[in-house]
Amino acid sequence: MGSNDLINEAYDDSEVVGEERESKSAWMKRWYQLLTSPLDLQLVINEKLEMINWDAYAKSLAKPLGNFLTILFFIIRLLQDNLIKPNYYKLNVKSGAFDLSKSNKLKEFDYLWEISSSFQNSNQFYAFQSWYFVTLRFLNNLFRFTIFILLSLNLYVSCKFMFGYFKTYNLFHLKKEFNSPNLTKHNLKDLSKEYYEDIYKQSLWSMLKHFFRGSRDDGPHVNQNEVEIFFQLRKWIPTNFMINLFVSFSPTAIVFLSFSDVSFTSAIAIVFHQYILDYIITKRFQRSVDDDLILSSAALQEYEDKHIMVRINQCSNIDTLSSAMGTRSKTPRIFTTHSLCGEEIREVYNYEKREFEALPKMTESVPGSRETRIKDYGGISQVSDNQSHPIGFHYSPRMSPYYRDKVLDNNLAQSSSNENLEKGGAFLPNQDQNRPSKSLSPLRKTPLSARQKRFEGSEFNVLNKNDINSILRSPKKKKNYHKR
């Protein structure tokens, strides 16, 4: 049993040793990849940073971080002006400037050597030998390095905030040129060229190749008659995280602390400056931008709700084109709103004035439905004098009397023409004698013999008989023979 336990323990130790070797080999591979391909590590870090939603940490991270850096800069400048500056001479004096023990001339004379040694032993305080000044010298170097780091960080944040957040928009439908330094005119041919921003993102060889070779205009040809101008807007859009970091770690406070003698009373000015800047930019200007966004969204939603559309869609419009009644009347949409008192207000859009007008209460009538219109126009409608009219030549009682009288006159004229045709003895070959003619042409209303006599007595009698017969027997022919 003891030998088996020893074997199991040896086996377990071998597994632990194997895991340690694997971990060491994995670390070696990672260090090798880090040293051989640092750009891959940079790419991974950039991807991780871009995936973070920094605007969500604007209040919890950016503002406290900026305030901490400002307070740190204030404390360092306070220590420099009140601790390092009074001892500046003692900290910067050279330790070996008056060391008499290193003089070869004094060593030649014994009495001078004794005097110099006694003088140095009596002076027990030297700036370069004291622990206090050694500590101050170290703090002075540390403060200088920290000030340099904070100034560089503040310069980076300021430049990134003011020049690093721009987006370019190409406006092809803008006609009016506004007075803005960010709005510029460009030619449409510029779209076919490579942008310099894309060139800068390429490799060094591609950049050199482009600048030495020159740009080539390989884009499509633009018609000179067309408008070749478009506007380009370069809009400044900083992130919320960068706005809070810039306000809390502002360059104005850093410049003030750098070029002034800092004391404890300077803290009052710094606190007042931080509060005013945060109140103006964050609580006023940024909220004003958010309010403008709310108004734009509300206006867009109102336009979508009140958008004037046709009362029928395209499919139903196509279906009703072949019917006898034609398409339905397109009446403007009536918008119903309510006043502050609860009264119902109906408005209609006026295209000439480009504004909504309130409808009076007497005219607030919505057109009838499709079923009621079909009932009004269906079958044969009865009008005055007990006369009936077929579909397509009548109007419902809702129509105006003017159109009703017009229809009656047309029907009387049609009936009289039918009687004249029945009295005449000649009809065209392609015309049915049992039903009245549908055409209202004068050529169809008169008999063939009367038309021939009238034509022979006119100025066209110089034509031969065949031409006359062809003209009379083909009234639908568009080209007529005239005397030349």
Swiss-Prot record:
Ranges annotated as biased composition (Polar residues): 430-440
Organismal lineage: Eukaryota, Fungi, Dikarya, Ascomycota, Saccharomycotina
Cellular component GO terms, alphabetical: nuclear membrane
Record-annotated membrane-spanning stretches: 145-165, 252-272
Region Disordered, residue ranges: 416-457
Protein's UniProt keywords contain Metal-binding: no
Function noted in UniProt: Member of a perinuclear network that controls recombination at multiple loci to maintain genome stability. Required for rDNA repeat stability.
Main location: nucleus
Record keywords, A-Z: Membrane, Nucleus, Phosphoprotein, Transmembrane, Transmembrane helix
Oligomeric and partner information: Interacts with CSM1.
Modified residues (Phosphoserine): 3, 417, 474
Membrane topology: Multi-pass membrane protein
InterPro entries reported for this sequence: Nur1/Mug154
Source organism of this protein record: Saccharomyces cerevisiae (strain Lalvin EC1118 / Prise de mousse)
Family per record: Belongs to the NUR1 family.
Localisation per UniProt entry: Nucleus membrane
Name of the featured protein: Nuclear rim protein 1
Superkingdom of the source species: Eukaryota
GO terms for biological process, alphabetical: maintenance of rDNA; regulation of exit from mitosis
